[in-house]
Amino acid sequence: MKEFNRPTMLMILDGYGINQDTYGNAIAAADKPHLDEIFTKYPGTTLKACGLDVGLPEGQMGNSEVGHLNIGAGRIVYQDLTMITKAIEDGSFFENEALQKAMAHVKENHSALHLLGLLSDGGVHSHISHLFALIDMAKKEGIENLYVHCFLDGRDVPPRCAEKYISQLEDHMKKTGLGKIATVSGRYYAMDRDKRWDRVEKAYNAMACSEGEQAPDGASAVNQAYSRDENDEFVLPTVIENANGSVNNGDAMIMFNFRPDRAREITRAFVDEDFDGFERKKEIKDLCYICMTQYDAEMPNVSLAFPPETMANTLGEYIADQGLTQLRIAETEKYAHVTFFFNGGVEAPNRNEDRILVPSPKVATYDMQPEMSAYEVTEKVLEAIETDKYDLIILNFANADMVGHTGVIEAAKKAIEALDKCVPQIVDSILAKDGQILLTADHGNADVMLDKDGNTVTAHSLNDVPLLHIANEPKQLKDGGRLCDIAPTILKLMHLDIPAEMTGKPLV
């Protein structure tokens, strides 16, 4: 039931990090008297917004998708790479039902286990440490025949560094006493995502039929490719002689890529009975195929090691369940973030959740119009506040992030100066209703726009982000928080219980 009639707003200044150093810092350089006054007048703290604190690998910069997921969920949302690595560290990986199923299938059929995926530590599609964990698991489970089908990277890592990874793999197999490299293919062939089936066919034929280029070992396969002037990404599918590692009836395959888009086509070629991408020279019967994550909800004849998790009781869902009303508002560039990502990857709005999309300006790059659509967003949100319709308003200003990405400091300063005109109007409007605002950011950007050598930085920063409580009677905020603490803080400020699923801590 509705007990709380004063409006609460979460205002996200996208890309507005906290940086005490003024060098290369467009936020510090901007003329922003109103924002300066707000930051001085109201109690605040800073929040961690990158790396392990938002479910990313240590030291990895945050981003808008991850930031809004964590804010809306009220818990750390582990990204696939981190989640799998964590499972390896805590040992649950080795008990994984789908992975165990593959091992059991191989033992029952006295057959072979094939591991396929991108051989690098790029961390975008896969990670070599996950492959090593699978080899360790196979050894522990008593698997005798194990083959690795190496897809070479050269995109998320330097263009010619495959030998390093092949050598690491061979060392690991030697140390474990299990495994052979069966094939080596550039990701251009094995990881196509644009239905260029002629490429996928070459990778399939190497793995299933031992057809293609031939080489005595993995390193030779790479060196032969280099002599043909092929970088890692483009290495022609190559079969390792005497490995006898083709995929046969009754075998099991584990695809260890966790990113779906480039794992779908090669997977479908092996598992789909109705496959029509190319004429398969050999169809594999009684194949147990495991995907590391969900590559495609419609993919037939596969099991998933790490199925997608649905999140219960995100902030939006919980507010709706309390019979309260909410508004999401942003310009085009950040609309998906305050809706889809904020709702835990769910497209449909919650009950009593209204949405306002303000079109972003049609310019080639936002340094040409650094105010973007901030004034229009402000106008719309002021109208919405005046209706007294909403208990919770989630607002995103895109400027510090999108103009920060252009690398043009003067434009980024103007972007912040536009916010300086908008934010105080909204503060006044909310305070006139005796409401409250939590002002924050999802990650930094405009706070670091030059590196120490004076080069332009267009990426996000690793800096903390602000959290202020703006109210007629503001509350002190506890230090040491991270983005997942925002939702529990909002609920406490609204005098609502915090659901058990939210493992973030209220900072009031």
Predicted segments with their positions:
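Feature captures the catalytic ectodomains and active-site-proximal regions of enzymes
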Residues: 1-508
